[in-house]
Amino acid sequence: MMALGEPYYSSKPDKDFNFGSTMARRQMTPTMVTKLPKFVRNSPQAYDWIVRGLIFPTTGKTYFQRVVVITGGLEDGTYGSYAFNGSEWVEIYPIEHLNLMSSLKLIHKANALQERLRLSQEEKATLALDVQFLQHENVRLKELIPKPEPRKIQMKWIIVGAVLTFLSLIPGGYAQSQTNNTIFTDMIAACKYSTETLTENLDLRIKLALANITINDKLDAVRQILNFAFVPRAHWLRTVFYYIHYYEMWNIFMFVLAIGTVMRSARPGTDLITLATSHLSGFRMAVLPTIPFHTTMTLWVMNTLMVCYYFDNLLAITMAILAPILGIIFLCFMEDSNYVSQIRGLIATAVLIAGGHACLTLTGTTTSLFVVILTCRFIRMATVFIGTRFEIRDANGKVVATVPTRIKNVAFDFFQKLKQSGVRVGVNDFVVIKPGALCIIDTPEGKGTGFFSGNDIVTAAHVVGNNTFVSVCYEGLVYEAKVRYMPEKDIAFITCPGDLHPTARLKLSKNPDYSCVTVMAYVNEDLVVSTATAMVHGNTLSYAVRTQDGMSGAPVCDKYGRVLAVHQTNTGYTGGAVIIDPADFHPVKAPSQVELLKEEIERLKAQLNSAAENPVTVVTQQPIVTLEQKSVSDSDVVDLVRTAMEREMKVLRDEINGILAPFLQKKKGKTKHGRGRVRRNLRKGVKLLTEEEYRELLEKGLDRETFLDLIDRIIGERSGYPDYDDEDYYDEDDDGWGMVGDDVEFDYTEVINFDQAKPTPAPRTTKPKPCPEPKIEAQPLDLSQKKEKQPEHEQQVAKPTKPQKIEPQPYSQTYGKAPIWESYDFDWDEDDAKFILPAPHRLTKADEIVLGSKIVKLRTIIETAIKTQNYSALPEAVFELDKAAYEAGLEGFLQRVKSKKQGPKKLQRAPEDQGAQNYHSLDAWKSLLEPPRERRCVPANFPLLGHLPINRPIFDDKKPRDDLLGLLPEPTWHAFEEYGPTTWGPQAFVKSFDKFFYAEPIDFFSEYPQLCAFADWATYREFRYLEDTRVIHITATEKNTDSTPAYPKMNYFDTEEDYLEAHGWAPYIREFTRVFKGDKPEVLWYLFLKKEIIKEEKIRNSDIRQIVCADPIYTRIGACLEAHQNALMKQHTDTSVGQCGWSPMEGGFKKTMQRLVNKGNKHFIEFDWTRYDGTIPPALFKHIKEIRWNFINKDQREKYRHVHEWYVDNLLNRHVLLPSGEVTLQTRGNPSGQFSTPMDNNMVNFWLQAFEFAYFNGPDKDLWKTYDTVVYGDDRLSTTPSVPDNYEERVITMYRDIFGMWVKPGKVICRDSIVGLSFCGFTVNENLEPVPTSPEKLMASLLKPYKILPDLESLHGKLLCYQLLAAFMAEDHPFKVYVEHCLSRTAKQLRDSGLPARLTEEQLHRIWRGGPKKCDG
């Protein structure tokens, strides 16, 4: 308790800091303390004692009364001030306390570090657990390794070894050079005279020497010999060494080696013979270290030559030297690896025979040769174990020095340093630096260097990142500054704070000189400077400077201190910088609308003039994403390495060009003076690689700069459409539809070819034209007939005389579908190998340019596979080729083969009386509309507008009988029998329209304006992350292309994908342009009933759900307007109410439930509507659509407003076609097949909750902040601080009387705990884990399916899914027991399928809870 008159402190940090007025703290009362706002725990607050009139408007004496004002950090991460008005705390304009703000910032940083520490500890524990798992797995796998059987020793090898050993122990049983003879020379005859003379002289000299030797001389000689041989003084050791000579040592060693060979060798015969020949030849120990160099063949060659050496050493030496030469010639038929091994063995044999003979002749022993060979092998082995170099790293892990370890590396560095340390030939210049022009840029992601230039602070764009404001540190002071502009380069311009304007400035260099550049930067708050010579590569520089942390954004200056570039990065070998120009300081001014229209008119005129001569196809430029815009994650590591290697190759190429330029560009008449000096051409460079090698290198890392020379060659020859990028696709003045204007007329009735068939190349010009903007150009038709030239203002694109259906082409676009490995993983045969690649003349120019080298490589693999009849390498090779094609915007070759095999669909032709419009336009159905006929499926309270010819059934009484279910045991739990697959007749269609009716809503916007305003405020506040969303291009939209294309396209195409393959994107763009120009076609929706598992009672009552789908062109127009918002909603499921895109796996369910529990409210509500999307009031649905539209970017919001109004009008007033051919009009509810059905239902659900909250509690915004909810369509689970009395009855009445919506009694469950409530088909248990709410429905879908499973593996996989869903159910639950029983049955039939028999408990918990790394409970 707080004593009266004592200052109040909320926590120990608050007492330690003691910010503000102590008098204000003394005024705190217990009532004021209990009503305090929710500040951050254990954080300081500042107390102020302020005059009341300065805060609350008042007059009289109360003006000068003082009130307590508290300022601090709130739990939602904001900074606010609150004043006590006598009864409660009221939020006021924040009062700035610099010390408090700094403290809160440090506390926030400390909390973040603690959180990082906690995560690191969790990761450490996870890694430790993984290590234990791996250790257990290692032990288990070791047990599975088969133990080798003991080798049986055969008696014959024991006998052979004994005989060879006996022969080896015979004295003189080896080659003696004195007794060798030769077949070429009679050595005895030649040396007879010399030998007799030498013998006589030798005997005479020995006799004279022995006559003069005394006893003392003999003792001294023995003593010196013993000392020289290091023989110990011990008498018994001298005796042993005396009797054991070299001869006896080798024989003992050979004897032991022979025994070991018999016992352990895998080829004892060959090894024993080698041992014997080594003794016989006299080479002995020198043979052993050469054996690993031999193959079986060369080993027998060596044995043969050693036997030959015993009889004739000169002949053996000659044959040994000739053996490698003959082997090189006669063994060339072998493959490379075997060929090299054989030649290596022959060379080793030659070295042994020749070297052994030299050693025996000079020293009488081969010990020296043995030592040399053994030393070479040891050095080779040591270099392998030690490594090539040592790396010395600093505390941050960055390499600061490398030390070579191999001898060749050390020698290379020595000669390099020796060459560099020659006589000084020049004088280094001084450079100008301005340390006062540098500062430090601090962001939450890290620090970098900036410099002052003009009125801006310049740094690297990747230092700023996505931050709008950054901290500028200069001379110990910190300033907040706003990021002004970031061009396409990796440069950012920051507005200089007013207090920093008098500082020094760096000017740009007008005459760049790259002979000596200076890099200045701050590293750990220390100024570092380095100079180097730079090389220019397009818009970038490279120089040999090692980058350290914090150098990004530093200025790169010339020797006069003028800025040349902005330092970017370091790939480990060279530093890099982007060149900065004066034009980079200011955004490029976008052309006005009039200028754009003029350019468009001129471009169209040029197209029309050249259409007859140069037919072209559609060109679509892929959006270019720079390296700065890419996020560095685990999945991007390979791309980043490729980009770095591409840059290093380009740097190396330019440097070599600069060095070789003086030698390669010698002109006639020039002298050789100065030819040896290095002259660098900094602006130009000659490619040293061939075009094929260059393209192969670019395929590993394409970017705009290095690929510009290829873009000009493929303009007009490459088709496709731009990928959607929600961050980089848009710009303020160009959103993809800028080419459409009010005064520009497009004729889209002409057929547009989106295929990749080889077009006629455009004529070459002397000056290459710049890459045009993505556009669609009409392909001219047959112009062979003479036509009168029309005036320029009347010229139009030629129209077809007769509408024709365009069949799918074999080279059609795949529309952005990435290749999937499963499509390639099948048994390939010779036909597949022959037809996977088209003939060379069928390849497009884009294929040749982008995929040329890969296609050549695949053709080689195909030829080899057909010859060897081994097709195992084809799937991976074709997959890699298709993957590269997909990344380049081309169609995969497997898809082309499929298109050929499938061929065009044989469907009825389009009606001839529709003219150029036929079935492409959105209102084409109107021309087919016939007068109404008999009313069969449309209820009487809906209008019957007419009849359309369609062939679709209105009866469905099919109940599939799956024979695979006969394998499953008979169930003992029959609760599932109340469910079944839907069947219907005409009455079900009539009944399905009841979803739109329950009660009539009132004009709630007029009756309850304050509550509606509160609901709007809450909706804008909840979905504020949708602010500034964009309209995307129609060709960048994503949608399920396997869906029906609606009427009348469904008469000619089964799916939208077939329609796209036949006609491409031209009809889509034409219809969007038509709507944009003011036309308002009426769209036709197609209605069908949903096949699903529902209660048998509903089936008997024909209560089946209806689904409506619109024309795919209309759906994609809606995707243009709302796809960006939908994508953002799916990304914010953790913090927002909408759960579309949410996954309950990996702890997702528990995390969401914990989020509601953490609010601390006492009440939890489960809410379920009936006929939810059908009874949504049209006024409310239109209002939600308007709220969504208000989040769109301001410029685009006004530009496309009329398109959005037309789109919403067709949602609210739907012309619907039934399978019976009847056409009616629906004006109620949210259609279940529109593009944003679940997202719109979420927003309507949330808006209704906010209205309901204000209806019972009043529009209390502070109380609303304690409210939280999660919604998925009509599912709702919420937590609220208060619930009124008789809540269920009152809320049901409110929705019926005000909105006309139906909430059945019993569908509103209010509890003081979240346990037992359900959301998205799961009930929350005590551990906040999911339990299926209706397991009997799941069992019905297993035993009474509406679709037959294809095979037994699918049935087993379905059972595994049910086991996963039942993970947290009671062990004795009938559904869980039955699933386990079924798994045991199906697992016996699938022993070799690769599927697990069942999921273990550990696997189930890993899937639901996320495992150690993603564990949420």
From Swiss-Prot:
GO molecular-function term, one example from the UniProt record: serine-type endopeptidase activity
Residues annotated as site: Cleavage: Q176, S177, Q420, S421, Q665, K666, Q756, A757, Q914, G915
Post-translational modification: Cleaved by the viral and host proteases. The protease is probably autocatalytically cleaved.
E.C. designation(s): 3.4.21.-, 2.7.7.48
The entry's keywords: ATP-binding, Coiled coil, Covalent protein-RNA linkage, Host membrane, Hydrolase, Membrane, Nucleotide-binding, Nucleotidyltransferase, Phosphoprotein, Protease, RNA-directed RNA polymerase, Serine protease, Transferase, Transmembrane, Transmembrane helix, Viral RNA replication
Transmembrane segments: 155-175, 240-260, 287-307, 314-334, 345-365
Pfam families membership: Astro_1A, Astro_p19, Astro_VPg, Astrovir_pp_1, RdRP_1, Trypsin_2
Coiled coil stretches, renumbered: 105-143, 588-615
Record PTM O-(5'-phospho-RNA)-tyrosine, positions in chain: Y694
Gene Ontology biological process: DNA-templated transcription; proteolysis; viral RNA genome replication; viral translational frameshifting
Alphabetical list of InterPro entries matching this protein: Astro_1A (IPR045835), Astro_p19 (IPR045833), Astro_VPg (IPR045836), DNA/RNA_pol_sf (IPR043502), Mamastrovirus_p20 (IPR022068), Peptidase_S1_PA (IPR009003), Peptidase_S1_PA_chymotrypsin (IPR043504), Rev_trsase/Diguanyl_cyclase (IPR043128)
Location of the region described as Disordered in the Swiss-Prot/TrEMBL record: 753-813
Limits of the RdRp catalytic domain: 1162-1288
GO cellular component: host cell membrane; membrane
UniProt biased composition (Basic and acidic residues): 784-796
Catalytic activity: RNA(n) + a ribonucleoside 5'-triphosphate = RNA(n+1) + diphosphate
Active site per the UniProt annotation: H462, D490, S552
Family statement: Belongs to the astroviridae polyprotein 1AB family.
Official protein name in the record: Non-structural polyprotein 1AB
Species whose genome carries this gene: Human astrovirus-8 (HAstV-8)
